[in-house]
Curated annotation (Swiss-Prot):
Entry annotation: catalytic residues: 134, 236
Keywords in alphabetical order: Lyase, Magnesium, Menaquinone biosynthesis, Metal-binding
Pathway the protein acts in: Quinol/quinone metabolism; 1,4-dihydroxy-2-naphthoate biosynthesis; 1,4-dihydroxy-2-naphthoate from chorismate: step 4/7; Quinol/quinone metabolism; menaquinone biosynthesis
UniProt signal peptide: none
The protein's name in its UniProt record: o-succinylbenzoate synthase
Organism name: Yersinia enterocolitica serotype O:8 / biotype 1B (strain NCTC 13174 / 8081)
Pfam families: MenC_N, MR_MLE_C
Entry-linked CDD domains: OSBS (cd03320)
One of the record's GO molecular function terms: magnesium ion binding
Stated role: Converts 2-succinyl-6-hydroxy-2,4-cyclohexadiene-1-carboxylate (SHCHC) to 2-succinylbenzoate (OSB).
Length: 323
C-alpha cells in the first residue's frame, strides 16, 4: 500500500540575504513524504528564485502529478524540473534505503571578510581549513583586498570564492591585481568570475587563479572535461536534478581530474542534512558547501547537528496534497 503527502514550508530568513537582484525574505519550498508498508522517505523540492528554471507553483503541479501516478502503482518519472527530480529521488532513495545515513557535516564556512571572526571559526574546524567568500556583490578591488587579508592572516587557509558571473573581464582583473601572486595558489577556485566561459578561461590563464564551473554545469551545452585553469565543478542538486544525475556529474568530474563539490541552494535543514549524506557518499574527500542554515531563522523537521535554531515540526506545516 502506497501513500504520499506534499507539505509546504515557509521559513523566515535573516535580514540582508540577497540573491542576485532581490532580497529573500522567506525560503519557501515543498516537502514530500512517501510511505510504502513500514518504510518512509522524505525529500525537499525548493526551487531557488533567480537561479532555478522552474517556479514553486510549477514544481508543485509537477510533484502532485508524479505523486498521483506513484500512489496508483506506477514508477516515478522524475521529469524535467531539477528541483522536483532531486526531491522525489531523495524521497525514493530514503524509502528504498539507498541513501546512506552517514553524513559529512563539515562545511566550508561562509565568511563575511573579518579575519578575526573567520580565525575563530576555523580554529574549531577539524581537518582541512576551507572557507567560502562571496565576491562580486561590492567593488572588485575591495573583494581582492579582503581575500588578500584573509590569506595573509591565516597561512593554512584555502579559500573558495564565488562571483556568480558578476564581473566584466576588467573588473575580474581589478580583483586579481589586489591578490598577491604568491597567495593565489591558496584560492582553491573562483566560481565563474566572468560573464562568459571564454572570459573566465582567459582570466584563469592570465592570473593563475583556478576557476570552477557552477552556473555552466546547468547549461545544455556543458561538458565536463579537463582544461587548463579549471579545478572543480560545483553541483547544486536542487538546480541540477536527480541523485542519479549528480552521481553522473561527480563520476565525470573525477574521471577528468576535477574536484566535485556538493553545494547548497539554501534548502531547509531537512534538505541540507540529505545533501550532507549525499556528499559523504559521493564526494567523501571533499568538504561540501553547505553553510547556509545560518541564513534562516528556523530548522525544518530534521535538525542539523549543533544548530540551536528552533525546529518547525511536521504538524506546523501546511498539507497541500495527500493520497
Amino acid at each position: 500500500m502506497r501513500a504520499a503527502t506534499l507539505y509546504r514550508y515557509s521559513i523566515p530568513m535573516e535580514a540582508g540575504v540577497i540573491l542576485r537582484h532581490q532580497r529573500l525574505k522567506s525560503r519557501d519550498g515543498l516537502l514530500v513524504k512517501l510511505q510504502q508498508g513500514e518504510q518512509t522517505g522524505w525529500g525537499e523540492i525548493a526551487p531557488l528564485p533567480e537561479f532555478s528554471q522552474e517556479t514553486l507553483p510549477e514544481a508543485q503541479a509537477a510533484a502532485i502529478a508524479e505523486l498521483q501516478r506513484w500512489v496508483n502503482g506506477e514508477e516515478l518519472d522524475l521529469g524535467p524540473l531539477p528541483s522536483v527530480a532531486f526531491g522525489l529521488s531523495c524521497a525514493l532513495a530514503e524509502l528504498e534505503k539507498l541513501l546512506p545515513l552517514s553524513a559529512d557535516y563539515h562545511k566550508a564556512p561562509l565568511c563575511t571578510g573579518d579575519p578575526d571572526e573567520l580565525f575563530a571559526v576555523l580554529q574549531a574546524l577539524p581537518g582541512e581549513k576551507v572557507a567560502k567568500v562571496k565576491v562580486g556583490l561590492y567593488e572588485a578591488v575591495r573583494d581582492g583586498m579582503i581575500v588578500n587579508v584573509l590569506l595573509e592572516a591565516l597561512p593554512d587557509l584555502k579559500l573558495r570564492l564565488d562571483a556568480n558571473r558578476s564581473w566584466t573581464r576588467a573588473k575580474a582583473d581589478g580583483f586579481a591585481k589586489y591578490v598577491n601572486p604568491e597567495l593565489r595558489s591558496r584560492i582553491a577556485f573562483l566560481e565563474e568570475p566572468c560573464k562568459t566561459r571564454a572570459e573566465s578561461r582567459e582570466f584563469a590563464r592570465d592570473t593563475g587563479i583556478a576557476i570552477a564551473w557552477d552556473e555552466s554545469v546547468r547549461e545544455a551545452d556543458f561538458q565536463v572535461e579537463a582544461e587548463p585553469g579549471v579545478a572543480a565543478i560545483v553541483i547544486k542538486p536542487t538546480l541540477v536534478g536527480s541523485i542519479a544525475r549528480c552521481q553522473q556529474l561527480v563520476q565525470q568530474a573525477h574521471q577528468a581530474g576535477l574536484e566535485a563539490v556538493i553545494s547548497s541552494s539554501i534548502e531547509s535543514s531537512l534538505g541540507l542534512t540529505q545533501l550532507a549524506r549525499l556528499a559523504d557518499w559521493l564526494t567523501p574527500a571533499t568538504v561540501p558547501g553547505l553553510d547556509t542554515l545560518s541564513l534562516m531563522q528556523a530548522q525544518c523537521i530534521r535538525q542539523w547537528p549543533d544548530s540551536t535554531l528552533p525546529v518547525v515540526t511536521v504538524d506546523q506545516l501546511d498539507v497541500l496534497w495527500h493520497s
